[in-house]
Amino acid sequence: VDASNAAPDLTKLRTARFKLPSRYSARPSDLAWIVDGGTYAKFLGMTEFLTMEKAGPLATAQTGQIGYVDGAPVLVSAEMALTEADGKVGGGTNDRGTALCVYRPGWFVGYRRRIAVSVDYLPYTDSYQLTATVRLAFAPFDTSVASLLYNVAV
């Protein structure tokens, strides 16, 4: 959904939310909004955005949740870059925000490679180094578990 270079508001967010199939969009507790830092700053200006002092202790540093919009938790991703007006990261200005609405049960996390542990002796410090690695996979259940609000003015 194109926000037309305007600040996010509840109408635009609901339009993006209801682009999801009704079996996904009907339960806000199963949804989450993932936003970039600039879009989060605009969310703070929305009267409909419930911050934790209003919404209670459900969002903590452990979950990363910073508030609610329309009953769905909001998460800020430092890895989500600003985009061009078309919602894609390009070589140009990249000065627009995005808000991604996801149906949380519609995503799978699995192992590409199980946990591998190695112990190495470091003679120069007379100590041991323990290293554990894992490769995870992340995939959607189907092609309709996410909806994007792009071209958000930040």
Residue ranges and their predicted role:
Residues 1-123, 134:
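Extended oligomerization regions of viral-like shell subunits
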Residues 118-154:
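Protruding loop/beta-arch "assembly-hinge" segments enriched in small, turn-prone residues
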